């Protein structure tokens, strides 16, 4: 053997020891195990093969389970220098005279000593050595010549491949699933210590360093930390394992197991035990300690004896809960020794050996295949991604559900799986520890299983009976509604038998006494499918169906194991299957159902509501046939009484509910088409087809988001060429409901079916069930009127009352038209959703701004109240003195009091509006603000008043003007009327900022009578001009009060709040449309007024924010009849577009030309028509000006009599620039038309 191979074998041996794998070279194969006596009588040549393979330089010992001890002792032996002995020890010592002596000792007084001396290794001996190293070698008794005929290189490579393999069957170094956790005895440890203390020569240090590095590579101290899933069972006190141990000993032979033989006390590491128990391993009492895994698989009958003792792989499936775990824990915790059972005749496979792993791998081909299938989860429990992963991983077969999708599995199926899990978990434990015989007959197990299932069903009867009573009561109420609906038709057209006779006529035969008897309505057939073979033969069944209990009759049958989707024959046609399907759908996809439907567990009321809505569901019983005959006689009149549908779309989820008048003619017209087609169908008996169609009509109500599918044997629909069929996406439900209803041309046809010749000519569906469901749900709208609730942007009722978009209005159309309207609404659904989110954000922002504004207004109200108080005090003072009574100071005080009073009231009105509307601006109001200026207010006076003023008959009036806009109130100065003046002119200029384009401003005129000043100014304020200088010394007595107080004061005191004495003479209201006027008519308030009744003023409105945009445009110019394009730098500012040749010329030169948008007649700036200009990205602006004599018609000049239209062609460089220019130009035109020309 070359040094490289020798080094690799030694390293592999060290790796196996560090990983806790038993030394497979010392283990014979289990199927070829021989008694120990045959091993002791081995020949010298065989022993010589084993001798150099000893790992330790010193003697080593290994202990077996039966108490046999094999001792390898060292003996000196002379060797000639010409033939050096080959050493395969850890330390390679050269030219060392050494021999090997093997002492084999057993508990019996028998000892055999074999001496092996040095000899030349021949090819035959090398082959024998390779046979000893190969773990997969079928080691027959030692004298068998096959052991020496193996190929040396193949055996070594196989062993190295087994140790370095990364297969799933190989034991994990962390989990330590090997069963050989034996501890070396003190003698072996002492022997190992003696060998380690021997001095090492030459390469000793290097070998020690290499061994340390190898230990680094195979360090197993970093174990995974597993959290305990459940409390570990009580375990006996076991001493921890020793850190240093020798190689695993030889396993015991089953022929040598003796009750009198002693087994060494095993020492376990508590961490290892807790880790194993957390992974699902269980403790058991047996002659050889093994760890079994709690599998939830059904054990096969044939390989049961082999799998019973086999150690499972390191990657087991997820353990399931078993009822035998606590029992095993109790048995293991009991310290009383249990009698050991007789060993099974089957050969056990030892763990840790490659041969054992190969045996497990071979077993997978037979029984393991069926067990692997049972380990899979039900597809209905998986998510969409997990089911997609099934097809991506390349498995041969898809997982199949326990029951058809949309229905829950029956109680027998669930309990059968649990019982199988119990048997699978109990099997490896009871086979080795229990004293009873494991091989029991299968009928007895089935009897026990039936007893358990019966007990479980009996416990559930109490709760099921209450549900059944509620279901029956709901069924009776629903069927009463259906019968009343058609009774009205019978009374109108024909005298038909009463519903009571019909119901009595259609009542099914009484069920057998073994079943639970309860009253059943006619449409769903009673669940008597499993009573008699005669009745069962008329129903389509899956091949493996068996008679079931009452609870099981509500479940759909399990589909075939070779198909992913169920076939037509897999579903039972009993009416209760529909209920079970609805139960599964309501629990899985509750967001797609009504809240009332999802509140109950069994949801029978939902089933009946669907039966009411479904036309096919009404035909299940004899009542359905009676209805059929009634609606066929009145077919012509019922088709004429079609009612429209109301389409409103504003829901958050794309859910569809039924709503409109439950007109029987509308329902009957759709039922008639279904029934006529159903009578022509040749699926078999009419009753079977009606039952199946009822099942599928109920199943068609399953939500689109359901992950499962069920078989469909009802109708599929062939659309007209004009209609469009778009599949409904499950997640982003942007469906196009363009399917024409059945009344408008689409006719039901046979379902497209395919016959599976390989599986008993079984009829299967071409498409998935979801495809047929979508077709049914789209075309069953005529059976019951449907109200489609669609998501729509929330708009205020005030906007709905006005002229809104078509999609904001309620439309009452025919079913076909409403489908197209709904489809058009679906297209803009995503946009509406985004608009709704943006509008919600704007509403929240407006609400917060409104609250902030309310706070500011309330603070302004407080300020104005203070002004009112101060003005009232001033007026009280003026009224209390003779000097200031009726003076100009009192008039100014009246003005301040008037202004503060109106400002306070305006703020309170605005606060009230904000609290009601909760927004600063109403929805749809313009956002542009401007500056409003009012000046030169002139009020003409009446001629009679002017004459009286000239004759000094009256004293005149004081006038003041108030300009009011929302919470803003402005006031002019008080101006008196003077003799000889025909009008009163106010010199003030009033400006209102942040005025919106929809403003309505009120101009109010107030006045009061004037009084002549009785005292001059000096006397009024007691100004003494005749005194020379001031008094040197003050007077002894206080200065006399020269202000004469009137004898009568205000009864409320000097601090009372006064009402303004200024009264309103008239008012005028103007808006943006009247700003070009200069004269407004006043609305007179009082009968006697000095005003003539009109007011003259100048009003100017200016946009506070002007539109500005700059960029290059290529402009078309007509030069002597020829067109030319010139590139210009254009600048839009307000209502004028100026252009230069270069951008730098904008600040230095005057514009080369300009375009005034005030004269633009284009309603909207868009792309120029191709008959005028075919250049890309060209905009057209048409302006109008007075006609000139030199105007000649051309491409850009169009004479129109007195006016001439001038076309401006402006070409942008890119499409984006053209769109930006169009947006800014249109905005400028809109503002100009709203605010008018700036003055």
From Swiss-Prot:
One of its GO terms (molecular function) is myosin binding. Residues 32-67, 230-265, 493-621, 684-716 are annotated as: Disordered. Residues 519-528 have a biased composition (Pro residues). Changing residue 1114 to I: In allele scra5. Strong maternal effect allele; abrogates cellularization of syncytial embryos. InterPro entries: AHD, Cytokinesis/Rho-signaling, PH-like_dom_sf, PH_Anillin, PH_domain. Keywords: Actin-binding, Cell cycle, Cell division, Cell projection, Cilium, Coiled coil, Cytoplasm, Cytoskeleton, Developmental protein, Differentiation, Flagellum, Meiosis, Mitosis, Nucleus, Oogenesis, Phosphoprotein, Spermatogenesis. SUPFAM superfamilies: PH domain-like. Changing residue 1143 to S: In allele scra4. Strong maternal effect allele; abrogates cellularization of syncytial embryos. Accumulates in the ring canals that interconnect cells of the germline cysts in males and the ovarian follicles in females. These structures develop from arrested contractile rings after a specialized cytokinesis in which the closing of the invaginating plasma membrane is incomplete. Also concentrates in the arrested cleavage furrows that initially link the oocyte to its 15 nurse cells in the early egg chamber and is subsequently lost from these furrows as germline cell division is completed. It comes from the Eukaryota. Residues 53-63, 500-518 have a biased composition (Low complexity). Disulfide bonds: none annotated. Residues 834-861 form a coiled coil. It is found in: Nucleus; Cytoplasm, Cytoskeleton; Cytoplasm, Cell cortex; Cell projection, Cilium, Flagellum. Residues 594-610 have a biased composition (Acidic residues). Residues 126-371 are annotated as: Interaction with and bundling of F-actin. The modification Phosphothreonine is found at residues 740, 831. The keyword Nucleus applies. SMART domains: PH (SM00233). Interacts with and bundles F-actin. Required for cytokinesis. Essential for the structural integrity of the cleavage furrow and for completion of cleavage furrow ingression and proper formation of the midbody. Required during cellularization of syncytial embryos for the proper formation and function of the furrow canals, the stable inward folds of the plasma membrane which separate the peripheral nuclei. Also required for the formation of the pole cells, the progenitors of the adult germline which are formed by cytokinesis of the cytoplasmic buds at the posterior pole of the syncytial embryo. Essential for embryonic viability. This is Anillin. The gene is scra.
């Amino acid at each position: 053997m070359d040094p490289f191979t020798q080094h690799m074998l030694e390293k592999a041996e060290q790796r196996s020891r560090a990983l806790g794998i038993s030394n497979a070279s010392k283990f014979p194969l289990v199927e070829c195990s021989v008694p120990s006596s045959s091993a002791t009588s081995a020949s010298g040549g065989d022993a010589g093969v084993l001798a150099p393979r000893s790992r330790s330089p010193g003697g080593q010992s290994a202990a077996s389970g039966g108490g046999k001890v094999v001792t390898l002792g060292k003996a000196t032996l002379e060797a000639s220098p010409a033939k050096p002995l080959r050493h395969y020890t850890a330390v390679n010592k050269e030219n060392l005279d050494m021999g090997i002596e093997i002492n084999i000792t057993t508990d019996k007084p028998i000892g055999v000593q074999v001496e092996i001396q040095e000899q030349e290794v021949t090819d035959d001996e090398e082959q024998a050595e390779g046979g000893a190293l190969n773990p997969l070698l079928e080691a027959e008794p030692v004298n068998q010549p096959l052991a020496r005929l193996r190929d040396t290189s193949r055996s070594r490579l196989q062993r190295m491949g087994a140790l370095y393999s990364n297969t799933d069957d190989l034991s994990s170094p962390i989990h330590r699933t090997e069963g050989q956790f034996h501890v070396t005895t003190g003698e072996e440890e002492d022997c190992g210590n003696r060998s380690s203390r021997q001095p090492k020569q030459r390469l000793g240090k290097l070998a020690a360093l290499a061994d340390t590095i190898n230990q680094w590579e195979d360090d197993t101290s970093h174990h995974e930390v597993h959290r305990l899933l459940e409390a570990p069972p009580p375990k006996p006190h076991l001493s921890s394992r020793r850190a240093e141990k020798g190689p695993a000993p030889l396993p015991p032979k089953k022929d040598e197991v003796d009750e009198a033989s002693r087994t060494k006390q095993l020492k376990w590491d508590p961490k290892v035990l807790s880790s194993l128990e957390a992974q699902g391993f269980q403790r058991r009492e047996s002659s050889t300690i093994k760890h079994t895994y709690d599998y939830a698989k059904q054990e096969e009958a044939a390989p049961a004896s082999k799998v019973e003792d086999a150690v499972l792989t390191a990657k087991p499936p997820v353990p399931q809960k078993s009822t035998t775990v606590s029992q095993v824990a109790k048995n293991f915790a009991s310290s009383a020794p249990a009698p050991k059972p007789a060993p099974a005749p089957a050969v056990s496979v030892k763990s840790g050996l490659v041969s054992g792993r190969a045996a497990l791998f071979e077993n997978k081909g037979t029984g393991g295949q069926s067990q692997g299938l049972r380990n899979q989860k039900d597809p209905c429990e998986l998510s969409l991604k997990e089911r997609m992963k099934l097809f991506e991983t390349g498995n041969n077969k898809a997982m199949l559900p326990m029951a058809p999708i949309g229905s829950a599995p029956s109680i027998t199926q669930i309990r059968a799986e649990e019982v199988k899990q119990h048997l699978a978990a109990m099997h490896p434990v009871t086979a080795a520890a229990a004293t009873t015989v494991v091989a029991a007959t299968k009928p007895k197990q089935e009897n026990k299983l039936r007893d358990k299932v019966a007990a479980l069903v009996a416990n559930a009867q109490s709760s099921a009976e209450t549900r059944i009573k509620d279901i029956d009561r709901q069924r009776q109420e629903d069927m009463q509604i259906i019968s009343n609906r058609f009774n009205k038709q019978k009374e109108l057209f024909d005298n038909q038998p009463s519903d009571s006779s019909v119901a009595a006529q259609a009542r099914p035969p009484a069920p057998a006494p073994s079943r639970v008897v309860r009253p059943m309505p006619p449409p769903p057939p009673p669940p008597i499918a499993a009573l008699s073979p005669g009745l069962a033969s008329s129903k389509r069944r899956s091949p493996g169906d068996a008679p079931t209990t009452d609870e099981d009759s509500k479940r759909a049958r399990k589909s075939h194991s070779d198909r992913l989707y169920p076939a037509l024959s897999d579903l039972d046609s009993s009416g209760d299957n529909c209920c079970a399907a609805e139960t599964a759908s309501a629990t899985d996809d509750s967001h797609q159902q009504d809240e009332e439907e999802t509140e109950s567990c069994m949801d029978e009321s939902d089933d009946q509501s669907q039966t009411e809505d479904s036309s096919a569901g009404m035909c299940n019983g004899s009542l359905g046939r009676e209805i059929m005959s009634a609606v066929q006689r009145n077919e012509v009149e019922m088709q004429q009484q079609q009612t429209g549908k109301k389409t409103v779309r504003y829901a958050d989820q794309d859910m569809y509910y039924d709503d409109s008048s439950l007109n029987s003619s509308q329902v009957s017209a759709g039922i008639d088409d279904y029934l006529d087609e159903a009578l022509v169908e040749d699926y078999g008996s009419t009753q079977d087809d009606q039952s199946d169609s009822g099942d599928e009509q109920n199943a068609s109500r399953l939500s689109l988001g359901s992950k499962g599918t069920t078989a469909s044997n009802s109708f599929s629909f062939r659309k007209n060429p004009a209609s469009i069929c778009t599949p409904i996406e499950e997640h982003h439900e942007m469906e196009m409901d363009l399917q024409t209803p059945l009344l408008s041309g689409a006719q039901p046809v046979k379902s497209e079916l395919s016959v599976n010749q390989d599986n008993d000519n079984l009829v299967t569906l071409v498409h998935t069930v979801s495809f047929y469901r979508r077709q049914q749900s789209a075309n069953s709208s005529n059976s019951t009127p449907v109200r489609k609730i669609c998501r729509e942007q929330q708009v205020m009722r005030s906007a709905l009352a006005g002229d809104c978009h078509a999609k904001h209005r309620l439309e009452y159309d025919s079913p076909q038209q409403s489908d197209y309207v709904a489809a058009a609404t679906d297209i803009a659904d995503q946009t509406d959703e985004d608009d709704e989110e943006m509008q919600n954000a704007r509403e929240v922002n407006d609400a917060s701004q409104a609250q902030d504004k309310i706070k500011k207004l309330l603070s302004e109200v407080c300020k104005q109240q203070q002004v009112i108080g101060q003005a009232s005090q001033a007026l009280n003072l003026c009224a209390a003195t003779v000097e200031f009574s009726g003076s100009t100071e009192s008039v100014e005080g009246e003005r301040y009091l008037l202004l503060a009073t109106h400002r306070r009231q305006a703020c309170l009105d605005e606060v009230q509006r904000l609290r009601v509307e909760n927004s600063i601006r109403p929805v749809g109001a313009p956002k542009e603000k401007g500056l409003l200026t009012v000046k030169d207010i002139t009020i003409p006076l009446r001629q009679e008043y002017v004459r009286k003023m000239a004759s000094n008959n009256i004293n005149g009036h004081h006038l003041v003007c108030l300009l009011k806009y929302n919470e803003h109130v402005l006031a002019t100065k008080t101006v008196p009327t003077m003799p000889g003046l025909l009008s009163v002119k106010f010199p003030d200029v009033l400006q209102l900022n942040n005025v919106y384009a929809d403003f309505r401003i009120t101009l109010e005129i107030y006045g009061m009578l004037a009084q002549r000043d009785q005292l001059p100014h000096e006397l009024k304020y007691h100004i003494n001009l005749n005194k020379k200088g001031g008094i040197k010394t003050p007077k002894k007595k206080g200065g006399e009060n020269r202000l004469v107080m009137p004898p009568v004061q205000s009864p409320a005191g000097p601090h009372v709040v006064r009402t303004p004495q200024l009264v309103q003479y008239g008012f005028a209201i103007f808006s943006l449309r009247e700003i070009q006027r200069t004269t407004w008519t006043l609305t007179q308030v009082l009968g006697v007024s000095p005003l003539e009744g009109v007011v003259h003023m100048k009003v100017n409105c200016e946009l506070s924010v002007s539109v500005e945009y700059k960029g290059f445009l290529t402009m078309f110019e007509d030069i002597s009849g020829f067109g030319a394009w010139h590139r210009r730098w254009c600048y839009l500012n307000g209502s004028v577009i100026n252009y230069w040749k270069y951008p730098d010329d904008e600040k230095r030169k005057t514009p080369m030309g300009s375009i005034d948008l005030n004269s633009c007649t284009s309603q909207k700036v868009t792309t120029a028509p191709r008959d005028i200009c075919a250049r890309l990205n060209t905009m057209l602006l048409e302006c109008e000006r007075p006609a000139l004599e030199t105007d000649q018609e051309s491409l850009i000049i169009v004479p129109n009599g007195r006016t001439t239209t001038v076309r401006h062609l402006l070409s942008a460089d890119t499409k984006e620039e053209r769109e930006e220019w169009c947006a800014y130009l249109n905005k400028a035109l809109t503002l100009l038309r709203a605010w008018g020309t700036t003055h």
